[in-house]
């Protein structure tokens, strides 16, 4: 996709954020939270991923999500000239996504009806200075650093999408892989719909076509496919895999206990990431 199209999507995304931010049941997560709020726009991000924060029974949560998305869609269509809203199916067949279009530009707003709540308290942040200069101001509830990047690490091993690998690349280059982050990542693994062993020792997938079609043109600085493959290789190096395997065995045993989440406090990051 051409960079111009990505830019127009970010413009629509930033214009939509104030109406989403009014709903305190949601916090922003994923690439948009990382690259527009936490970092100074190293890459463009074109979807709005939300975490539903209240921890309530499933049916009550689904009803509230439905009502809240309706309010968001109504506010956007009323305040953004030419904006059109369409509810579309998300996880589990529920209509937990909004498609927001303005002319030829389309973005998606979505939340998971399954993965609800956060591990750590949320923050209220404003977009970075560069984002404000180029696209305008926005402020919103954002997941904590550990939740943001714990979820991002989970996405990286689950999907191996170039966007996720790029975000992990900058994590390695900046904050690094802390014990608190690793424990939060394990909680996301435990909450996943996939078996933990598949995420702690994933199979390699071919990402070249996805890189060309869904990533090239998004970053400020040019990024080669090999750069992202190196991030993945680092994660699957012999030292790292050995550490993962040890962690996986301990984690799998702990996960069968009555209260698995409370047993994660003594887990440490793999030795490959010790500084």
Explain the meaning of each model-derived region.
Residues 1-275:
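Compositionally biased terminal segments of proteins
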């Amino acid at each position: 996709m051409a960079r111009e199209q990505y830019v127009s999507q970010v413009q629509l995304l930033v214009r939509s954020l104030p109406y989403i931010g009014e709903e305190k049941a949601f916090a922003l997560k994923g690439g948009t939270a990382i690259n527009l709020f936490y970092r100074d726009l190293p890459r463009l991000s074109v979807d709005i991923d939300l975490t539903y924060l209240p921890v309530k029974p499933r049916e009550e949560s689904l009803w509230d999500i439905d009502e809240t998305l309706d309010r968001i869609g109504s506010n956007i269509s009323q305040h953004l000239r030419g904006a059109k809203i369409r509810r579309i199916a998300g996880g589990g067949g529920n209509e937990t996504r909004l498609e927001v279009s303005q002319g030829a530009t389309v973005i998606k707003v979505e939340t998971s009806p399954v993965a609800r709540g956060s591990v750590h308290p949320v923050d209220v942040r404003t977009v970075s200075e560069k984002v404000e200069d180029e696209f305008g101001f926005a402020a919103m509830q954002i997941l904590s650093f550990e939740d943001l990047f714990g979820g991002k690490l989970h996405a990286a091993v689950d999907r191996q999408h170039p966007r996720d690998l790029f975000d992990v690349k900058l994590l390695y280059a900046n904050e690094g892989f802390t014990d608190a982050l690793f424990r939060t990542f394990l909680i996301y693994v435990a909450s996943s719909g996939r078996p933990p062993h598949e995420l702690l020792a994933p199979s390699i997938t071919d990402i070249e076509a996805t890189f060309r079609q869904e990533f090239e043109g998004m970053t400020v600085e040019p990024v080669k496919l090999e750069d992202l493959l190196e991030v993945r290789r680092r994660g699957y190096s012999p030292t790292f895999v050995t550490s993962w395997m040890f962690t996986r065995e301990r984690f799998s045993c702990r996960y069968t206990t009555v209260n698995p989440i409370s047993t994660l406090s003594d887990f440490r990051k793999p030795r490959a990431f010790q500084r």
